[in-house]
């Protein structure tokens, strides 16, 4: 079969998508108002970079393509400013975090686009249950074969990404005792988990065309894998991260993945084999459950190693790529978080323990979401 086209991208160019919670300023619950928000944004600058998601209490911002994490950060701040200004006119708030702590998925409303209606008819309750919030990171690849290699090689590091970004300890009003409960939600979808062990762009093209011919998929979006190729963009897309509480944290995560991807593409240190996926689900569970305090089974070692230690060792290994990309400032900050076993899940638990109020927790999350910006005038505090 002929090859799928793959748009050539600059090596490790970056882009990100961030899904945020739309919050009612009085009750601090999720509120289904993305239709109103999209109408209010109609004539705004960056309008095409702010999008609805499958349920109406979600909103997504998309960066454009960047070479540097700093440039991306500047753009995300501009997008946030537009959301803040618009929210003031319709009395809503926003926050990060992979889950809303006390929302009930049964109360969610599907956004009335043709695509989302079709997905709801296909997946029914799973669609509403997917009212969880993630950061997706795109990494540019020069060729389809590079994209396939990177998709498999990064699988080794998925526990890093989950542990660093974890921000969803509460779900449906309970403490799940997971650092990232969000990362367990999509397992029920078909075509979730990991890409099949396809070793070249030719093999992937053959697989894709078969799945299309059998009417299992219509396009690349029907694959819900943790990491998937995006040939129309010339990227691979990492989909396992919870939405951080701050824009700053989203940049730390992106800067780490960008440098790691450059190391993997330049040095090809990961030997692709089925062994990568023998341990994948267990390692993923360790990160979801225990975060930075989880353990990692590495196939060339006799015993598990702490995820935290593996992250720090990896950062040492890729230092020249970090510095070459100008990401040193962000990785230094990330290192401090890892050494101190601090991710957003730890912070969320700490805030909640202060007085045991979910409403005050969400209010604090809204404040944290604005911590990158100086404009806090519109935020309503709970009484």
Swiss-Prot record:
EC number per UniProt: 6.3.2.2
GO-annotated molecular function: ATP binding; glutamate-cysteine ligase activity
Pfam families: GCS2 (PF04107)
Gene Ontology process terms (BP): modified amino acid biosynthetic process
Keyword annotations of the record: ATP-binding, Ligase, Nucleotide-binding
Domain of life of the organism encoding this protein: Bacteria
Protein's UniProt keywords contain Mitochondrion: no
Catalytic activity, as annotated: L-cysteine + L-glutamate + ATP = gamma-L-glutamyl-L-cysteine + ADP + phosphate + H(+)
Record-linked PANTHER family: GLUTAMATE--CYSTEINE LIGASE 2-RELATED
Family to which this protein belongs: Belongs to the glutamate--cysteine ligase type 2 family. YbdK subfamily.
Known role: ATP-dependent carboxylate-amine ligase which exhibits weak glutamate--cysteine ligase activity.
Record-linked NCBIfam families: gshA_cyan_rel (TIGR02050), PRK13516.1 (NF010040)
Name this protein carries in UniProt: Putative glutamate--cysteine ligase 2-2
Organism of origin: Legionella pneumophila (strain Paris)
